[in-house]
C-alpha cells in the first residue's frame, strides 16, 4: 500500500532515552564523612523527586506521554513531504563549495595560497596514506572537507538512506519523484569526486548497519564510470528541464554526465603503463581495453545533447563590444549576477544559518582581495597564469618581446582585466583608515626607490604598512568573482558559486571534437567563447596538436579558478610540465623614474611526482578494510 504523504507535524516520535550514571570512581567518594554527606543529600533529593512526581501525576496523568519536540520517527519523516525535502536539502550541503579560504586553484598551477596552511605538501607531491595535509578529513580548515573520502561516502550513505526509505514507504507524487531525480544526481556528483581523485572506488548502494559486512573491495574504473553515468541518466529522465538552478535539473544531470565522460576518455586513464608501470591492478585506475574513439564519441554526444536542449546561452554571447572595457565588464558580470542563461548548476551559501568564523565561511572577497584593502590576499595568481593570457590580437604574451616586457599589462585579453589585479590597476576606494594613503584605489604591488637608495613598499605588498602578515608573494591578486561595490572587510557578497556553466559544456564538446579529428567543428565552438570575450577567432590554419594546445590554453583562461585546472593537468598528463616553482613579479621604480623595472622571481618551490595523478587512500580506511587496494606509488 502506498504511503500517504502529509505536510504536518503530527505523530512525532516517542522514543525513550534511558541513560544511567554509575557511581564515581573517585576514592574520596567512599570515605566515611564524604559518603554520609552524599547519602544525606541523596535522601533529600529523593524526597523532592517523589513529591514532584506526585504533584505532576495529580495534574496530568498523561504527562509521560508528551512527545519529544526535537525528534521524529522514521514513519513520520518519510511520510511528510516537507521533512523529506529537508532531508534532501541537507544532502545538497555536501557539494564542494569553491569560495572557501584555500581554493582548488592553489593546489595546481593557477594560484598560490599565502598562509602556508598545509597546501604545500600537495604541490610538493608529499602526500601519503598517513599524511594528507590540507586534504585531510579532520583538517582544521573545512575548505576541502566535502571532497574527502570520508565525507563523500557519508553523503552517499544519505542518498542511499533516501532511496531505501522511498522504497520502504512506497513514496510517490510529483514532489517526491523530483527529489528522487535530485538524489540520483547528488549521488553521481559525490561519486564523480571520488572517481576524479582516486579512480575506481567501492560502489555502495545501501546504507550499512553494524550487522552488515563492511568490507567492500574497489570497483574497476570502468565500472565506476558506468555507475555514475547510469545515475545521471536516471536523474535526467526524471528531472524537469527548467527550475531552480540551485537544485538539480535535467540539464545539470546531462552536463555532469558530459564532464564525467570527457574525463574518462582522457589520456591519464588509458596510460597506466606510462606512470604506474608494474602496478598489479591497472583496472582500478583506468581502462584496460575497449575502443577509445568510442569513448570520445560518447563524450561528444553527451555534451551535444546539452547544447541541443536550446535553453542555455553564453552570457553576452553576441559580443560586438565597442571597446575592451565592455568585454571585460561582461565577463566579470557572469559571476556577479544571481542567475543567467549560462548557469546550469549553481550553489548558494546560507550565511544566516551557518554563521561560523570567518575562516569557515566562503567569503571570497575577504579571502582574496589585497591586504592594502584589508583583504587577506589568499589565492594569488601565479605568474604562469598571468602570462597565459593572450594579447588582444590573439598572439601569445612573451617576456622576450621587448615591447610587451616594457608594458606587460597593456593590450591583453579582456578576461585578463576581469580576472587579475596587477600593479597600477584600479580596484575600489580604500577603507576609511587607509584612503588617505591612496585616494584613487590603485593596486600597489611595486617598490619605490627613495633618494637614499632605500625602497618603500607599495600598500599591497607583504612589506607594506597595512596587514603585512597577509598579501601576495607573486605581485598579483585575484579579481575574478569579486564585486568592487562590496566592502569585503565587513560585508559578504551574495552571488552563487557556479558548479556548472554552459561555457564548460561548449569547451567539453570542442575537446572531444579535437580528439576525434573534427577541427572545424571544434574551432566553431571555441570561437563562440572567444567572441563573447572580445577576442579574435582562432585561425583556420590551426589544426591537430597546435589546435589542441590553443584549446587547452583557452580552457585555462575561460575557466580559471573554477575547479577544473587541477583535474585538467592530470587527465592531460601535463602536470610534470606545469607544476614548477611558482613565479612572481618584482616591480621596482628607480628614484625619479616613472617607468618601472620588471624581474621574474621564484616565490614558492613546487615538485611533481607521478604518484600525485591520484590521491592515496587514507591509512585508517585501509586498516578498517583489508579488501581495499592502495593507489600506485604510495
Whereabouts are the PLM-identified features?
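Bacterial Sec-dependent N-terminal signal peptides
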Residues: 1, 5, 18-80, 228, 258, ...
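An aromatic- and glycine-enriched ligand-binding surface/loop that stacks and positions planar moieties
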Residues: 11-14, 31, 60-125, 199-201, ...
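Conserved, well-structured interaction surfaces
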Residues: 73, 81-99, 120-198, 211-250, ...
